Every structure is written in C-alpha cells, then in structure tokens.
Amino acid sequence: MCGQSGSTSFAFLSMPMSARLNSLGGNNVSVDNGELSTALCNPAVLSDKTHMSLQLNYAYCMSGINAASAIYSHNYKENRFAAAIHYLDYGKMQYADEYGNKSGLTFGARDMLIDLIYSRQLGPMFRVGAALKPIYSIYESYSSFALGADVGAHFQTKDSTFQLGLSLQNIGWQLKKFYDGPESGNRSMLPLNLQLGFNYRFKHAPIRIGMTIHSMQRWNLGYELSGKSTYVLGSKKGMTSEEWALAQDNGAVMWYDMMFRHTIFFLDIVPRSEKFYITLSYNHRHRAELAIKDQRSLAGFALGAGLNIKMVRLGFAFSQYTKGQYIYQASLALDINSLMK
C-alpha cells in the first residue's frame, strides 16, 4: 500500500496523503497550483498561494485501513510556514501463534506523523524549502520513534507554463526501535527518496503534462522475496522464451523495465481559471510489482478530479494497487483568509 520500500522502516511515509497526490501517481515535486498538500512531497512548493489555508484529507484504503491528515499554512513576508499532522490506523488484527491459530483476541496498530514545513522565495521564479518530521508508530505494545527531514527546491517560469522541482525526502532514522532485545538489530533508516519532476502547461489548451523521477539514489528498486532477490539484466539476447520466463520467476528484470519503475507520468486537464481539474497518472513501479500476472487490473493507474469553488477546494481520487484492493481519497481545503474578509 505504502510503496515498496525494501529494507527500510516507516514505509507509510511513501503513501500519498491527499487526493491530489494520489491522482498525480502518489508523488509529485513540481506542480504548484495552490494545492497545499503538494508541499508534503517538496517543501519548496509551499507558496504565497496557500496563505491561511486549511486542508483536511481522508483515505479509505484496502482491508479497512483508514488515514486522515490536516494541514494549515501561513505566510510572513517572504517566508512560508505550514504544519501538518497525519494519522494512519490499520484497524483491529487478531493474535495468532506461529502456526496461524487465532486466539480470538485483537490488537491495534497506528502510525502518526507531524510535518513542520518552511519555504522561502529567493526571487520571482525560485524557492527553497525544508521540513522536519517527528514520526511515532505503535503496533500492539511495541512502539518506535523516528525523526526525519525533507529539503527541496522549485523553479517556475513567470507565466507558470513550465515548473521544475527537486526534493530529497525522508532524511533520517529511528531514534527508538520497536524492540531493544539482543536480536533487534540496528536502527532502521527512513525510506529515502530523491526526486526530480517537471511539468509543462500548454498555452492554448487546458492541458498540463508532467513526469516525476523518483528513488534516484538507488538504481535497483527490487527487494528480496521468498529468498529471491531482484536483479537487472542488460540483455536477454540468446535466451529462449522458457529461459526468460524462468529468469523472471527468479527475480530478473530488464534494464528498461527498471528504468521506467523510477518514473511517474501524469496528464492534467485544467482550464486557465483552475476552477476544476481532471487528472490521470501512471506509476510503472506500482504496476510492475503489484499487478497480478495474466489478470487484468488498473494497478499503477490513478484518476482524480477536483473543484475550486470560491473559497473551497474539493478533491477526489481513486487508485487500484492490486486486484480487489483500492484506495479512495477525499480532500477539503478552505481559504480562511478569504473567509475572514
């Protein structure tokens, strides 16, 4: 659900926290259109467009998992500030022994995050930003605390037709492990994510297209599963179809497949007035890792829509992670500055 983080902890940090982020493929570091939640991926996106904005987000995920967040922003001269709180509840789970026998008793699991965001305008077209993120998780009676940070930069032309963003997310590690016993191992790192994104808005058509390149700090996005590790092949020349099928079963991935697993593509239909938007995106990593072989699904695709009605923004998004498992998200944003006038 939260992205495939491999050996790191706090994988929920990879989950899109709003309908807009979900519709953009789960992550976006370049789009600046007054949507407050995009600053959660790149703190430099926080701009004067979001002054005194309050945004509430809710997500219903697979298997009864619920997530909610609230974000508020305020500007002071050339400085932009925002604070967000996120809560993820995995619901009730049953105790079971090592053989899978359930006792009938249940326990809960929750993740919580506070996001303190700052950005500063360094000219008419360039901003930088940073965020500090205390993180707390409790699973049954085991708890963990971590501290993370994000840094980012954002550029856009004066007419906003072209936007470029760069962000390094989740710099940090656990300060308190879930378990401090002799076999608990070292403190885990957070799921680091170096991203570069851009988008272009056509001058004479209500269309914006863009791409995000994520996880740039790591070429091989595979992980070990059932004793098999993902490995990248430069060529399958000379291999029969049976040999290639066997190699795939053992974790082989072609280089161009791995390259596209680093990309997210999106298409925005949005008029100049920005009174509404319709967004379609494709995340190849989600599809490659979560789609079930030989079965049709929309894994990797996300669809979203939003309305901007005077002082209120509404957003809705839908994505399928695997067959029968969906995420539905809704967002409500209020322009408090306009409401008080």
Can you say where each PLM-predicted feature lies in the sequence?
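Subset of outer-membrane beta-barrel
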Residues: 2-341
